[in-house]
C-alpha cells in the first residue's frame, strides 16, 4: 500500500511539473573577438522592427566558466511555445537579420547551437524575469536505454 501511495504522489508531482513545462530555449554559443561591438550590433538589431516583433525573449550572456569549447558568449532565445519557435526560425531569412549576420561575421565565430525543451519552470513565469539558465551537456551512448 505504501508503494501505491508513493507512486501516486510521484506521478502527481511529475504530472504537475509537466503542466508547467512549456516552450523552448535556443542557445547559440559564439566566440566574440570584440564584445562591445557585438553588443552594439545586437542592440541595433533588436531596436529594428524585426527585433521588436521577434517572438522570443533575447538575451546575451558571457560565459564565466567554459572548459567545453572556445565560446565566450551565448545568445539565448526564450520561446514560449512551438508557434513562436517556428515564427522565430522563419524570421532568420529576413534581410534585416541577414544584414546583422553579415555585419557581425568578423566579430563572432559560431561555435555551437542547441534547442532545448523547457522541462520544469518555477517561480515567475515571465521570460523577461528569467535570465538565468542552467544547461547540462551530456553525451548519451544508448538513447533507448537512457529514455527508459
Where are these regions (language model features)?
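Short S/T/G/P-rich N-terminal loop/turn motif that feeds into the first structured element of a domain
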Residues: 19-148
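Positively charged n-region of N-terminal signal peptides that target proteins for export
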Residues: 1-4
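Bacterial N-terminal signal peptides
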Residues: 7-16
Amino acid at each position: 500500500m505504501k508503494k501505491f501511495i508513493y507512486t501516486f504522489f510521484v506521478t502527481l508531482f511529475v504530472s504537475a511539473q509537466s503542466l508547467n513545462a512549456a516552450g523552448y530555449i535556443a542557445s547559440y554559443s559564439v566566440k566574440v573577438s570584440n564584445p562591445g561591438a557585438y553588443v552594439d550590433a545586437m542592440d541595433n538589431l533588436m531596436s529594428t522592427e524585426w527585433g521588436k516583433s521577434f517572438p522570443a525573449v533575447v538575451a546575451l550572456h558571457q560565459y564565466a566558466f567554459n572548459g567545453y569549447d572556445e565560446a565566450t558568449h551565448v545568445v539565448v532565445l526564450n520561446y514560449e511555445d512551438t508557434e513562436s519557435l517556428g515564427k522565430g526560425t522563419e524570421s532568420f531569412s529576413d534581410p534585416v537579420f541577414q544584414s546583422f549576420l553579415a555585419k557581425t561575421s568578423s566579430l563572432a565565430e559560431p561555435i555551437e547551437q542547441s534547442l532545448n525543451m523547457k522541462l520544469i519552470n518555477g517561480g515567475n513565469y515571465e521570460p523577461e524575469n528569467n535570465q538565468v539558465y542552467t544547461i547540462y551537456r551530456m553525451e548519451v551512448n544508448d538513447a533507448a536505454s537512457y529514455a527508459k
